[in-house]
């Protein structure tokens, strides 16, 4: 069993309702106000309804399987290695796991998906994944997986079929699943499609051709993919690059999220969906109109986010009070767009710098930051 010394593992912070914070504060204040005249024999009545937190309010541990825990000595982390560390994750207080992409891919990060219905052989098999879900259920750990809907790999059968048809001057349903244009468009994000006269759009990298999420046949296929994983026991999805579904068009992006959220909830009502909309506060907040459960709160994460600047006291406005005010304002804003919104604050993830560097390796600050 090989356990890597440098793990690519990060935390998606716990999500708390404002009411819970107020209840805790009220309890503390009432305790301070006691004058000692009451005794246990006097008794107290509690007539309020139980404040049961929704099952989707959890603390998630992000796992990059590739470098987490290697069970077979091949130098690459795998699902069986992750299973062996579930007690460790649970003991730390996490009741949710977010898996970065686990589907077949040509890259180490696996955000260029080849096949949406299987597991990358470096990580294991579908049977291994089923066992992971089974073991997580025993520990009340909910598993969500990264689902990349913005693009695929150029090695996807969808894309290869589309390019082959264009080269032969034939028709194919897969052509409509991507964004193709004849000739070379002015934008740098377009690349030649094989030996054809067509180019395909790929904003991130030429190995990741963008999908056309307005295509109804593609949407039907995506629904099949979502149902496949939900039926396997997945608790939900982390939606990658949701801001880029239609770059520069938030209305269309919100429509895509609404469609996907509505479908997933129709299959599994309690599934949890969180989207990556890497943008400023006012811009990403509007995406809650889609009805999605959560959006990553980028205004609180990263080296420049509210958590880091507060703990580093970076400026006169970064006090504990200003942090509390910002937290309440954020949650009120999210709830104004979606009354069932769940804030998803995070401190750092695979796209940002390492947390230790934010505080000059001050262990106390790092621990407090995770708690915030």
Where are these regions (language model features)?
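Acidic/aromatic-lined carbohydrate-recognition and catalytic surfaces
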Residues: 32-223, 231, 238, 242-298
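Glycan-recognition surfaces
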Residues: 185, 262-357, 371
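Structural preference for long, well-ordered alpha-helical segments in enzyme cores
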Residues: 86, 369-372
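Sec-dependent N-terminal signal peptides of Gram-positive bacterial secreted proteins and lipoproteins
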Residues: 15-35
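Acidic (Asp/Glu)-rich catalytic clusters
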Residues: 90, 230-231, 334-339
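Active-site rim elements
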Residues: 242-246, 355-364, 370
């Amino acid at each position: 069993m090989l356990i890597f010394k440098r793990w690519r593992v990060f935390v998606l912070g716990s999500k708390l309702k404002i009411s819970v914070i107020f209840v805790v504060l009220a309890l503390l204040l009432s305790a301070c106000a006691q004058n000692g005249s009451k005794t246990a024999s006097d008794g107290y009545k509690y007539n309020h309804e139980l404040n049961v937190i929704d099952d989707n309010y959890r603390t998630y541990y992000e796992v990059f399987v590739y470098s987490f825990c290697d069970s077979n000595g091949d130098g690459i982390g795998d699902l069986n290695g992750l299973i062996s560390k579930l007690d460790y994750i649970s003991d730390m207080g996490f009741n949710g796991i977010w898996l970065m992409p686990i589907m077949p891919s040509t890259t180490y990060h696996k955000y260029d998906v080849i096949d949406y219905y299987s597991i990358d052989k470096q990580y294991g098999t579908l049977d291994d994944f089923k066992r992971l879900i089974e073991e997580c259920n025993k520990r009340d750990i909910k598993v969500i997986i990264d689902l990349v809907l913005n693009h695929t790999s150029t090695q996807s059968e969808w894309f290869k079929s589309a390019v082959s048809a264009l080269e032969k001057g034939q028709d194919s349903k897969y052509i409509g699943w991507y964004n193709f244009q004849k000739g070379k468009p002015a934008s740098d994000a377009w690349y030649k499609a094989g030996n054809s006269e067509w180019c395909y759009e790929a904003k991130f990298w030429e190995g990741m051709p963008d999908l056309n999420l307005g295509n109804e046949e593609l949407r039907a296929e995506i629904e099949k993919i979502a149902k496949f994983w939900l039926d396997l026991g997945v608790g939900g999805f982390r939606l990658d690059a949701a801001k880029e579904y239609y770059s520069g068009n938030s209305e269309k992006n919100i429509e895509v999220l609404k469609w996907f959220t509505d479908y997933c909830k129709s299959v599994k009502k309690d599934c949890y969906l969180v989207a990556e909309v890497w943008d400023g506060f006012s811009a990403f907040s509007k995406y809650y109109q889609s009805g999605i459960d959560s959006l990553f709160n980028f205004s609180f994460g990263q080296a420049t986010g509210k958590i880091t600047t507060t703990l580093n006291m970076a400026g006169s406005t970064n006090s504990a009070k200003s942090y509390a005010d910002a937290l309440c304002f954020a949650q009120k804003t999210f709830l104004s767009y979606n009354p069932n919104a769940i804030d998803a604050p995070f401190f750092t993830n695979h796209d940002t710098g390492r947390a230790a560097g934010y505080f000059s390796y001050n262990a106390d600050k790092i621990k407090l930051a995770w708690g915030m």
